[in-house]
């Protein structure tokens, strides 16, 4: 196994074990603003990931949702991009739709991606040129020929705000679940045709999933039609995203942007 991938998998498992110590237990919840909660579990997992990954690769840069950003990463060839607990709202609600997300970026490209759900024990993993796996079994993006049969994984908050209402009769099913990263893993495993978001996301939300999607034979683009180059000074990706099987992404892009 790729040594960097092995390191990322072990780190994600360690963080996941820590998170489970807090799951359905007492912990402190803070609000970072814009209804964006953070818990002591997020911080504990972040500290463990940084300790494990940066101790092993001190020359790499670091970008995490829960760490104060440093411009030092912008000069690094390789950067760890992590979200220690993607799906914090679901974690707080006791819903098992959250993951530890660990990616390694080299010259702007995600070359290692790991998503670990510590409740279900699902381990999505990929390294550039080596394929994508779910619990060591190969996975691949899949899609149906007809758009009106396709399953789209989307956001619970976007659904509540009515952003997907115009497309309710276009696709086969709009399935709203939590955690951007988890949705990318499920899509890479062929459990849905597409993951799509109509709102901006950050690099740490999607980086590991992007690697896994790529290695599962799919692609990820923003709603301007461009792939993401990672380790940017501004980490927000606007205006939204689509990922999945290549042909399904093209069809969905045309529908969501009104270019079909």
Predicted feature residues:
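N-terminal subdomain of lithium-sensitive/metallo-dependent phosphomonoesterases centered on the IMPase/IPPase/PAP
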Residues: 1-85, 247, 257-258
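Short loop/edge segments at beta-strand edges and connector loops
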Residues: 64-66, 136, 178
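An extended, acidic
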Residues: 142-260
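DPxDG-like acidic metal-binding loop motif
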Residues: 73-135
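Residue-level signal for inorganic ion chemistry
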Residues: 19, 42, 53, 88, ...
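Short, solvent-exposed loop/turn motifs
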Residues: 110, 138-140, 227
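Short loop segments at secondary-structure junctions
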Residues: 105-109, 119, 128-131, 137, ...
């Amino acid at each position: 196994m790729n040594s960097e991938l092995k390191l990322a998998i072990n780190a994600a498992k360690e963080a996941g074990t820590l998170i489970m110590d807090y799951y359905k237990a007492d912990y402190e919840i803070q609000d970072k603003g814009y209804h964006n909660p953070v818990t002591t579990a997020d911080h504990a997992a972040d500290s463990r990931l940084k300790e494990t990954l940066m101790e092993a690769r001190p020359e790499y840069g670091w970008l995490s949702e829960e760490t104060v950003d440093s411009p030092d990463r912008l000069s690094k060839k390789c950067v760890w991009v992590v979200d220690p607990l993607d799906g914090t709202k679901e974690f707080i609600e006791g819903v098992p739709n959250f993951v530890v997300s660990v990616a390694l970026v080299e010259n702007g490209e995600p070359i290692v991606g790991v998503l670990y759900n510590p409740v279900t024990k699902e381990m999505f993993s990929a390294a550039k040129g080596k394929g994508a796996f779910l619990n060591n079994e190969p996975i691949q993006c899949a899609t149906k020929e007809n758009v009106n049969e396709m399953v789209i994984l989307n956001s619970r908050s976007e659904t509540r705000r009515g952003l997907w209402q115009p497309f309710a009769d276009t696709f086969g099913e709009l399935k709203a679940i939590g955690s951007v990263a988890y949705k990318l893993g499920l899509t890479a495993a062929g459990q849905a045709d597409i993951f799509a978001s109509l709102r901006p996301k950050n690099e740490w939300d999607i980086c590991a999933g992007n690697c896994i999607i790529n290695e599962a034979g799919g692609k990820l683009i923003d709603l301007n039609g461009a792939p993401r180059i990672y380790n940017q000074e501004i980490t927000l990706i606007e205006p939204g995203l689509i990922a999945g099987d290549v042909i399904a992404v093209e069809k969905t892009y045309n529908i969501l942007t009104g270019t079909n």
